[in-house]
Each structure stands twice: as structure tokens, then as C-alpha cells.
Amino acid sequence: MDNEDKISISAKEEKILSFWKEQDIFQKTLDNREGCPTFSFYDGPPFATGLPHYGHLLAGTIKDVVCRYASMDGHYVPRRFGWDCHGVPVEYEVEKSLGLTEPGAIERFGVANFNEECRKIVFRYADEWKYFVDRIGRWVDFSATWRTMDLSFMESVWWVFRSLYDQGLVYEGTKVVPFSTKLGTPLSNFEAGQNYKEVDDPSVVIKFALQDNQGFLLAWTTTPWTLVSNMALAVHPELTYVRIKDKESGDEYILGQESLPRWFPDRESYEWIGQLSGKSLVGQSYEPLFPYFQDKKELEAFRILPADFIEESEGTGIVHMAPAFGEADFFACQEHNVPLVCPVDNQGCYTAEVKDFVGEYIKSADKGIARRLKNENKLFYQGTVRHRYPFCWRTDSPLIYKAVNSWFVAVEKVKSKMLKANESIHWTPGHIKQGRFGKWLEGARDWAISRNRYWGTPIPIWRSDDGELLVIGSIQELEALSGQKIVDLHRHFIDEIEINQNGKSFRRIPYVFDCWFDSGAMPYAQNHYPFERAEETEACFPADFIAEGLDQTRGWFYTLTVIAAALFDQPAFKNVIVNGIILAEDGNKMSKRLNNYPSPKMIMDAYGADALRLYLLNSVVVKAEDLRFSDKGVESVLKQVLLPLSNALAFYKTYAELYGFDPKETDNIELAEIDCWILSSLYSLVGKTRESMSQYDLHAAVNPFVDFIEDLTNWYIRRSRRRFWDAEDSADRRAAFSTLYEVLVVFSKVIAPFIPFIAEDMYQQLRGETDPESVHLCDFPHVVLEKILPDLERKMQDIREIVALGHSLRKEHKLKVRQPLQNVYIVGSKERMEALAQVGSLIGEELNVKDVHFCSETPEYVTTLIKPNFRTLGKKVGNRLPEIQRALARLPQEQIRAFMHKGQMVVSLGEETISLDKEDITVSWASAEGFVARSSASFVAVLDCQLTEPLIMEGIARELVNKINTMRRNGKLHVSDRIAIRLHAPVIVQEAFALHKEYICEETLTTSVSVIDYKEGEEWDINGHAVSFVLERVER
């Protein structure tokens, strides 16, 4: 494709964008549907602190398709855009830009100053976002955007929180939660699940000495840094453990029996002492590894605890427990009154309690701790292990699990409501409902919603010195309690507000909400519910539709579900499309640093937004699978789908204008069979599209219309071309024009939601004066039942299957399509052969074969060969496969033909018989010399490849036509221009030209031919003969 084509595509789309804006078409679509049923849509809010990427464009395209379709299908579809403004993504950018990386730096800079800096950068890339949203062809209302940092939005978030609190679903507690040391704040479980990586970590086995020199317990860990906080060991009470003596060291070790070969693979290296049960170990005491917390021994520490979660598939069957740094450890130790110690600060550094490592980052201390244990003869094994480990989704730093005091939403209390809500949601793809999302709901944990950060919605809890709480649910309530006018709810406006009540002073707790809480409250907060627009909000809840990426099953989809189920015992949305992840072409994550992907702007400038949209929509990524992005794939969509469609429109326009066709004059038109077929295919497509869209299955909706473009361009128009060229104003020509006009107009409406630019371009070139101003103001087409002819569609499908089979035979055996052949034999069921007999000439034309023979039996020129399908049959018969192979080789052709008809056969193996189906057999063909054969799902085709002299001469004539018409196109001649030819060629080519002169001249609009004896003009290879032409336009 040349640069001129690319420029024209981009320029045409920009022109359509201008048309939409100048004529305010989006607003007109809303006005057009005012008073119609509302189709409610929630838009997942992006952060404008980063540039949009292909993932955003994909999700935006999916949303746009569904909303455009709903609008064309008779719904009022408001599409408000929203912005996520709070949280770590914004704070982190400000911290980096201002160098506020040290602990306490933000406080020294001033929370007010820091928050105002955050406010300044929130919309850093808003203009770029608007550009890309427009350029991809997505329609949203930027004039009515909602923002999570707006006063009205934040007040509604307070109302949501207060409502949860009033239901007893909010509590303060200490739990082990994912913790980002880079940010100094806890994260939610679903945030921790968003960024796992394969990493190499230490793998150590530690020797814990039992009291009174009773030997050592071996415990394995991948986090040596937690060993300074060890408070207990755990065994499974039902597992069997062993005591052995290491012959080299003389030390006695206790470990799980199943893990023994893992750590002592050499049986001769140890002496067996005996077995003991896990239950017998429970309660025994051991010596602390480090002296830092040995005083806790008096408080039930350093004992062996029972734990039924222990498995022997890895490790030693004995687990080291640091209750401040592991969720299972925390609960087990809490149950047995083991004290909690947490000598790690919010930056991940050891506190003064660990005096030998104070101030050192815990991950950096792993080697030093292992070295010390080795020096003290407490290290049994040291190595590395490769495993998946969670990283902070924003800073890309490793997370830890840490016991912190936090405020929680009691999600586990409403788990049954969430599961019930999920049952009523329609998921696309469907497996996510009970799979990824359903399983996540089943394992849902209480949600840590408090963050000790700055730029966010403050948690509206005021606490007195004696622990009494005031939970505020509105600005009016805060103003009444404080006596102050509230103009902003951010921390630096309300942190100093003190409430005095009943002789007590209340101050706000120093936390803001997890920004996912803002997102989950979006259905209500976007409308300032319940303070404003209550009726509108309730009427649009749950949303009819949402869409985001697969990662949001543990993000936005989840938080929406938590809050909606808790407050209203309903889902937040009825239908959801989940897309997969777009990767770079090499399979890696797209990375600016690696520069491993083309920019979206470059792709749209080169190939157009429609090509990008269709490439994404017609890929596995809309089925929640990963897509390796390829610019060649986008180019292929343009060249193989969109340009042929544009060419079909250009073909119609050229000849309709040439012959003055008026689409309003449809009287006395009798359609040809091929007209009826394309119209039937069109309205069948309308039905399929409607059905797929009702199921929110975009991939199923797109596939058929891509195939229809092939039907239209490569079959209907190509097969009907001569009808359009008819110089006389015949009824047949009018039928062809009328049919093609109807197809193009209706099809422009079918594709409008998916590829809106080319749809608009087609419609604008076809619409009449009284038609709606834009294709997007039209109704989506309805099925016209009387035009759907299933038998005709099946017959045409059979014809095309046969033609495709014949062409594949030609390609396989290097037989040019332009070389005529004498015979083709089509083998199929008697009924289908009888139905196809009347279209033999059509098949002959397509395959360039003189005689088409329809047979219910394979002709004598071909022998059918069958053998076992080893892949399927091997599973059924096992070692009897060779016997079956020999039996099949002995079968006569009559039995094989019977099998080909019935699809089943019985093979005798001695006294035993085995039934075989088509899937058990592979079929091939042995042909007599001069014949070739091949089969499809329904037919066998046998081509007679023998070339006679007349066939050879006609083949030369057809090649001449092809090359002359190629020169016409290259020479930019108009389709109606007449030409004169000067020809230099060998005698055989001259004879072929003379023999088929009338045909050649008619096909190329040639009026005269001169044979010259010298080379002139462009040279071509015509079936092995060198030929040169000169073409000259002839004035009429």
C-alpha cells in the first residue's frame, strides 16, 4: 500500500471527525433518542497522569461499539466520561518530581502544599486523552465529566461509607495485609494480585534447637528477614515426622517423613532413629534464634503449634512463624496467644529492637542474617528458589505482608450477597463468571480501606481521647457539628477541624480511603447521590453495561460488587465485557523504555482508526485472551477488508453515475438468483449481528460481517460485473444496481457501531435528501424475513465450497486459474448433486473448466485410500492399531465408497468387530496420470489436467487479457476508455490473439491491434513466451 493511500485514509477520517463535530452529530443522537428507554453505562475512570495506551483504546472501542449499537437500536445512551484523580498514581508522580522520597519529606513540605501540587497535575494529559478518545472514533460527553476529587463526589463517598458503617460493616483492627514499603502504606488483596513476577529469592533451612539438647527442628523459608521476628514453629498434627542422626555432624534432626528424601537424598548419610506424630511435637519449646525478643518466652512464645494448612510438597513439614508478616502465621499465633512483634517500619527497615540490623532494608538484610546464622551453626541449607512474588502495582517494588492497624470493610459478612449478585450478571466471556471472578468472590477477605497517605478522600471518622467515634455522612452534618463552612473535603481543609460534643474533643483519624473505594462508589458519587439526582441514579442502577480489562476482575468489577451488594443487595451492573491484555509483538509487556511497540497515533495515521478498531475487535483480545499486537495485522485488515469495501462503493458510484442510475426507481425490477442470494445473506447477517450483540459477544458479531465483505466483493460484484457493464438500460442491469445500492446502504448501518468512519463515508455517498443526516442517526437494520432464503444460501455455500476446493487443487498442482481445463468431476451426495446440476456452468466459469460432471460415486480415474487416524484411534484401540491398519489396507473400493457415504464402518479383527467413525479415519486420493483429486468437508473434486492445443491457445488469450488490463490500470485509464494495441509476440501468441481476438478486444475495450516486429513498451511473460505491448487511448 503506497503512502498516498495511507494519507487519504487518515485525511478521510479527519474529515469525518470534523463533520461529526461541526454538525454536533453525537448530541443529535442523544436528542434523537430523548424519551426512549435509557441504556445505562458506567465508564471505568482512567488517571490522566499518564498517556493512554492500546489497552485504553481497546476498552474504549468496546464501550463505543456497544453504546453506538444501543443508540441505533432505539435507546437513549448518555456517555459521561469520568476521571480518577486520587491516590498513589498521582502522589507518586509528585513525589518524584519534587524529590520527596525520604521519610517525613511530605510532612516537612506540608500536606497542604503537597495536595495542591497533586491537584495541579491531575489533568496533565487530559488533552492527549481527549485527542485519542476522539481519534479512535469514540463518542463520550466531556462536558459533563465527573471527577473523584470533586466536592460532590467526595461527599457521596462519605455517604457510602457512613451507610456501610451503620450496617455494622466497618471496623478497626490489626491484620496482616499487603504492604508497599516504597509507598509506606497497606494495599488491598486485589491490588496485591495485580503485579506478580517470577523472581529468585533466598531458600534457607534453619536449625531450631529444641530445649534440653533434644536435637533440631528443620524449618524452611524464602524470607530470611522474617526470622528475627520468629515467635513459633508449626507442625501438622496428623502428619508423620521422623528423627534422624546426621552421620557427618552428629546432629539429630526432626522433619516431615515425606520431605526426608528432599533434604537427605543419600540414605547412607544418616542414621534412622524413629518416627513420631505431629501431635506429639505440639507444645514443645525451642531456643530463640535471635536474642531480640527472648523475653517473649514468658508470654507463650517459642513453642510448637498445630496447623492443618501445612503441606509436605515443599519445605520440611515444619513452618517458621512470624505472626506480624504472614496471614496464616498471624491467625495461628493469635489462636494460641503467641505475642505479636513487628520490628519493621513503614519503609521496610528494621527498628531499634533489632539492634544489629537497625535501619537496614529488610530485603537487603537477607544475606547478613543467613551469614550470621551460618556462623552460629544454625543454618542447615542455603540456596535460591524461583517463584511468583507480588510487586506494588504502582512503584514496581516488592510487597511484604505486614501486621498493621487499619480500617476494614467486613466483606466476608456480605460474601453471600456478592455471590448472589454475580449469579444475575451476564459475563462475556462466560467462563469468568464462575471462574476468575466467581472464585475471587468465594475467597474474598475483609477489605483494608484506610491508607496513611495524603491526596485522597479522607475517612470521615472523628475520635475522642477515650475512643468514642463520630462517623460523618455529609457536609451538612460536619458543618453542624463543627460550626465551620466546608468548601473542600481534602485533608488540608478538614484535618484541623475539631468537634466538641458532650464535653469531649474529637479529632479526625489520619487516614484517607483506598482510591479503589472511590471507584467502587462511582455509580452513586458521579450523580452526587443521594443529595442530588436520586431518582435518575436509581433508575439507571444497576448499569446495563460496563467493560474493562481482565485485571479489573480483582479491581473495579470487584469494588463495584462489594459496595452494591452491601448497600443494595444487588449487582452494580447487568452485563460486562472483559478484554484481555495487549502485549508487544514479541510477547513481552509493552514498554516505552524498550520501545517494543508502535505508537497508537502512528498506527492510526498510517492505517486509520477503523483498521485498528476492527483488528482489535476481530481478535482473541475481546475474548479476554492476550493479543500480541502487530502493525502488520492492522495493515492486513485495511488491505483485505476495508479497502475492498471501499472499492465496492467506488465500483457502484462509478457505474451508477456513468449510467445515471436512480435508486428511487425500483419499479418492474426482477431480481436474479445472485441478487436474491446477496440480499438473503445481508439480512441473515443483520439477524446474526443482533443476536450476537444481545449476548454482548463482539467477536461473534464482527466475524460474519468480515466474511460478508468477502461475499460482496469477491463473489457478488465479481460475478455480476458484466451486468453493471451492460450498455443497454436493461431490467437486469437495474436489478443489479438496485440490489447493490440496498446492500451498501443497509450494510453501512450494520457496520456503523464497529467501524464508524467507513460506515459514515459509505452512507454519505449513498444517502438521499430525506434520509437522516448521519448513519449514526439511523435505526439499526431489522431482519426482513421474506428476503431470507436459507436453501439458496446453502446452495451458494456449496458452490463456493466446490470452487474453493477446485482452486486449492490448481494451487497445489501449479495450474494457473487462467489456464482452461476440460473436465472437473464433483463427487457428493445424490441429493446435493441433483441440486447443483443446474449451476454447473457457474462452477465451470469460476474454475475455468469446460465441462462439469456431478457424480454420486468417485470416478474411475481416482482411487480412495484410507488409513487410521493415529491421534484419535490410538486412544480407542491401543496396541490393536496395527491390526486395524492392515484390515483397512485390504478393503475393496466398494466398501470404502460406502464408508464415505455413511461415515461409519465395521472392521472385523478375527471374531471381534470394531466400529469406526469418520474421525477415526484419514482419507487421501490416488489419481490416474493427468488427474488430481482433493476433498473438502462435503465434496470430492477431481480435475482433468490434460492440456489440448485449443486449451493452450485459450490460456494464452486469457493471460493476454489479464496483462492488458493490468497495463490499463497502471496507466490510469478510465474504465470506459477505448484503446489501440501494438503487439510484439512470437507466432504462437499471435495465433492465440487472432483466434480469440473478439474475446480479447471485448474484455479490454480494444478497437484495433497492430502486430510489430520489434520490441516496444512493457514486456511480459505469457505462459513462457516473451511479449511486449504498447497501449494508446483512442478518442471516441
From Swiss-Prot:
Its EC number is 6.1.1.5. CDD domains: Anticodon_Ia_Ile_ABEc, IleRS_core. Signal peptide: none annotated. A motif ('HIGH' region) lies at residues 46-56. Its cofactor is Zn(2+). One of its GO terms (biological process) is isoleucyl-tRNA aminoacylation. It comes from the Bacteria. InterPro entries: aa-tRNA-synth_I_CS, aa-tRNA-synth_Ia, Anticodon_Ile_ABEc, Ile-tRNA-ligase, Ile-tRNA-ligase_type2, M/V/L/I-tRNA-synth_anticd-bd, Rossmann-like_a/b/a_fold, tRNAsynth_Ia_anticodon-bd. The keyword Aminoacyl-tRNA synthetase applies. GO terms for cellular component: cytoplasm. GO terms for molecular function: aminoacyl-tRNA deacylase activity; ATP binding; isoleucine-tRNA ligase activity; tRNA binding; zinc ion binding. It holds the Pfam family DUF5915. It catalyses: tRNA(Ile) + L-isoleucine + ATP = L-isoleucyl-tRNA(Ile) + AMP + diphosphate. It is found in: Cytoplasm. HAMAP family: Ile_tRNA_synth_type2. Belongs to the class-I aminoacyl-tRNA synthetase family. IleS type 2 subfamily. IleRS has two distinct active sites: one for aminoacylation and one for editing. The misactivated valine is translocated from the active site to the editing site, which sterically excludes the correctly activated isoleucine. The single editing site contains two valyl binding pockets, one specific for each substrate (Val-AMP or Val-tRNA(Ile)). Catalyzes the attachment of isoleucine to tRNA(Ile). As IleRS can inadvertently accommodate and process structurally similar amino acids such as valine, to avoid such errors it has two additional distinct tRNA(Ile)-dependent editing activities. One activity is designated as 'pretransfer' editing and involves the hydrolysis of activated Val-AMP. The other activity is designated 'posttransfer' editing and involves deacylation of mischarged Val-tRNA(Ile). This is Isoleucine--tRNA ligase. It comes from Chlamydia trachomatis serovar A (strain ATCC VR-571B / DSM 19440 / HAR-13). The gene is ileS.
